[in-house]
Amino acid sequence: MAKLGEVCDILNGYAFKSNQYTTSGVRIIRISNVQKGYIEDKSPVYYPCDDENVKKYELKQNDLLISLTGNVGRTALLEEKFLPAALNQRVSCVRLKEPDKVLKTYLFHLLNSDYFEQQCMKAAEGVAQKNLSPKWLFEYKIPIYSIERQKEISNTLDKIDLLIILRKQQLAKLDELVKARFVEMFGNPSNNSLGFPYEPLSNCLLSIENGKSFVCSNDMRQEENPAILKLSAVTYGVYQQDENKAILDSSMFVKSAEVHKGDLLFTRKNTPELVGMCAYVNDTAPNLMMPDLIFRLNTNEKINKIFLWKLINHEFFRGKIQNIATGSAKSMSNISKERLEKLAIILPPLHLQNDFATLVERVDQQKQTVQQSLEKLELMKKALMQEYFG
């Protein structure tokens, strides 16, 4: 065992002023850029190259960056593509002193482990916002194996990481296949490029059902006890039954609000970007209820639920959904039942909708196989990380 500060230099960042950001120069790596395992920088900010603090807080390729505020303990490896770069405040840079004694890949896997992140959370101070001390990082003890053992550990975890990436890419490609097939069969739904008839959504529905409001625990339910779905069970367009909260009094269970296989659930309230997302329930455990932030869309014989699900969530149609929402750009947006019923949608022949739904079902079966493989890999990685690092 060795202290992290004995094998690494631990450097703090600088409070670069946002009013001096430029559109080019040296990239400033902020705490928001440091995600678990990677750097996220879709909206980069820069500082003038000749600024003295830029030179003082300059980062190097393969530096390990650790978040010190909020979600503390997230660790990312700085790749060459992000250089030149400088370190902002509340991010620590961990830089190996002797790379021939500790491998950067080994140290990255160690610091990117769930165990290390949990230890950071425990050590962090603050109520409203957690803060981690660089001094604690210096004192944190890490296992140091022989170089041969470090290589073995790194190679094993690298191989699993690669397989995990490949499985995620497979899932993304299957999703893209469905989106592409939708456009091929039905055109661009935002401008009805294939000229299908329009109908108000109300003409395709038997009813829109509301969920219920309950006093809940913050914890997920145990076994199959009654629970209410969280908004996140539907938010991203795929039904997630584990996103639920136990209700405090099981006698308050409302049968009419229970979710069933074949339901089409719609988020009536969310952020402006995510409001109006839809999820089809391929299967579900019993005793899960809809919250009052979710509608259930009960369709009639004019429309296939799976077609409607993919239409509502399609990137080319999202603008129309967001246009019927009310609320300011900075607040939660809301879609009323009345506005939803008036939404104009394309209505292709039912046989085309059914053909498309059959494709979606086949693709979902393939996704399920890939997802199961992904989950096994993630469990394997978690077990190995526990074995190697605690």
Where do the protein language model's features map onto the residues?
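Periplasmic-binding protein-like
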Residues: 116-119, 317-320
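A short glycine-rich beta-alpha junction/loop motif
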Residues: 85-92, 102-105, 125-148, 287-295, ...
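Sequence-specific dsDNA recognition surfaces
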Residues: 5-18, 32-64, 202-218, 232-264
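A short beta-sheet element
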Residues: 30-31, 54-112, 230, 254-313, ...
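Non-catalytic DNA-recognition/assembly elements of restriction-modification systems
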Residues: 1-13, 139-155, 169-212, 342, ...
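A generic structural signal for short beta-strands and their flanking turns/coil linkers
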Residues: 25, 43, 88-90, 225, ...
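Contiguous mid-protein beta-loop-alpha structural module that forms a pocket-lining wall or clamp
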Residues: 163-168
